[in-house]
Amino acid sequence: MTIVDVITIDGPTASGKGTVAHKVADALGFHLLDSGALYRLVALASDRAGVGVQDVDTLAKMAARLDVKFGPDRVWLSGEEVSQTIRLEAIGNRASAIAVHQPVRDALTALQRGFRKLPGLVADGRDMGTVIFPDAPLKVFLTASVEARARRRYKQLIDKGISANIEDLLRDLEERDARDRTRAAAPLRPAEGAYRLDTSEMTVEEAVAQVLEWFAAVR
């Protein structure tokens, strides 16, 4: 049986894991799984359908039949490109509220594991190393101070032409962190054996280089 390499990069919102994962995947020629986008897609689809964030059964059914396609920096839901829409703060907050439900997470598990294909996979999220790919040869837990993360998220949104208030972002991040850490379903924590990387004072290039160095060492 062929073993497909997986690098998991977990961490809190706006820790830089998505950017680092994308660049690591590019450097290695690996596939990329943005698991957070899946929850955002469920959030968007359920919002459009008028489904409440506590309607767990309906949310889980929507997650199980999610019609999603990923491309370089792009994502489609039922044939409609929603790359920018799912990055709205309101959708992110809704996704965070939906992600606490175990049936929703279970519905997305098989879909996420299906991304594990040759030549390899870089998977970013919150439970990639703890739940989805616990056998990954390299697990990274990326973090940064909440202030650094708020500044990054503010810049990301402004660069995309989306209005933002840094005080509101800071408060939202603190609320999401608390929700992610304390939820019963797959709480945010470093996986066993994970390498921890604080990117508060690091450039993206430095973080990517460190992950690639670790991967070379564990292969």
Curated annotation (Swiss-Prot):
NCBIfam families: cmk (TIGR00017). The keyword Nucleotide-binding applies. It is found in: Cytoplasm. PANTHER family: CYTIDYLATE KINASE, CYTIDYLATE KINASE/PANTOATE-BETA-ALANINE LIGASE. Its EC number is 2.7.4.25. It comes from the Bacteria. It catalyses: CMP + ATP = CDP + ADP; dCMP + ATP = dCDP + ADP. The gene is cmk. One of its GO terms (molecular function) is ATP binding. Keywords: ATP-binding, Cytoplasm, Kinase, Nucleotide-binding, Transferase. One of its GO terms (cellular component) is cytosol. ATP binds at G11, P12, T13, A14, S15, G16, K17, G18, T19. This is Cytidylate kinase. It comes from Cupriavidus metallidurans (strain ATCC 43123 / DSM 2839 / NBRC 102507 / CH34). The keyword Translocase does not apply. GO terms for biological process: nucleobase-containing small molecule interconversion; pyrimidine nucleotide metabolic process. Belongs to the cytidylate kinase family. Type 1 subfamily.
